[in-house]
Regions:
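Feature marks extracellular polysaccharide-active and adherence modules
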Residues: 84, 92-94, 103, 111-113, ...
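The right-handed parallel beta-helix/beta-solenoid scaffold, focusing on the short coil/turn
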Residues: 79, 87-89, 98-100, 106-108, ...
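Short, charged helix-to-loop "capping" segments that act as catalytic/coupling loops
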Residues: 113-119, 157
Length: 242
């Protein structure tokens, strides 16, 4: 909120808002969208995209039952792509972009096929939606979502890991490997978890198996999992014995 308020304060506020504006925010970012946005909504989207460090943002906002494909004709590779508040839409992204945010969307299907330069996708507070991934993704973050499907077309496309928190009925398929995650079920055998704060990491372990581990914080604040910390300690002890 503070970041958004600061951005609003920096805007000139001249002229009436028009559809498809290119709005300079914080003298660093441009937001392009097909609908009229309030200054606060413009600022919130810009703040979400690293508070001014993303030079250009293309946003699909509050669309309903839209079927749309992004390619080289309507998406430039220096843009961050944002989907927010969409209902019943189908989007296909075939061209390059910097990063993708999906938030507050319901009953939508997203096909990500074009190269994502940062290999980062963030999904927040969505329901009954599908993410069909056909490109390399190193970090996929899914938070506070309900009844979501995430499908990587091939195992090789998940080049890193998935972080999730506060999700109910999250189905993840990576190639032929399948995993189902649910906060309510997790809470049933671990009463220390918190729906807002506790994060989990889905990744492949050293045996090549798709696993899900709770993220813990070391004394120095570094985030890891118990399995990763145990492996580090084992390797450290072996080094000391040499």
């Amino acid at each position: 909120k503070e970041a958004a308020d600061k951005i609003i304060a920096d805007q000139n506020g001249e002229g009436k808002e028009q559809p498809r504006p290119k709005i300079k925010i914080g003298k660093k970012s441009l937001v392009t969208t097909e609908v009229v946005l309030t200054k606060r909504e413009q600022a919130r989207i810009q703040a979400k995209c690293a508070a001014g460090h993303a030079a250009k943002i293309l946003a699909e906002v509050k669309q309903e039952k839209v079927v749309k494909t992004f390619d080289d004709t309507n998406l430039q590779d220096d843009h961050v792509l944002v989907f927010t508040g969409c209902v019943g839409c189908t989007y296909t992204v075939n061209s390059r972009c910097v990063k993708i945010f999906v938030e507050k969307c319901t009953q939508c299907t997203f096909h990500f096929n074009g190269k994502i330069i940062t290999a980062v996708v963030e999904v927040d507070r969505c329901e009954e939606s599908n993410l069909l991934i056909g490109t390399d993704v190193g970090t996929l973050q899914v938070e506070q979502c309900k009844r979501m499907n995430v499908v990587f077309a091939e195992k090789a496309l998940m080049t890193g890991y998935i972080i999730w928190a506060g999700c109910f009925t999250l189905r993840v398929q990576v190639g032929d490997d399948l995993m189902r995650c649910d906060f309510e079920l997790t809470k049933g055998f671990d009463n220390t978890v918190n729906v807002e704060r506790t994060q989990f990491k889905i990744h492949y372990n050293t045996l090549g198996k798709l696993v899900c581990d709770k993220i813990i914080r070391l004394k120095n604040g570094f985030p890891t999992t118990k399995m990763e910390d145990d492996e580090f300690q084992r390797m450290h002890e072996q080094t000391l014995k040499v």
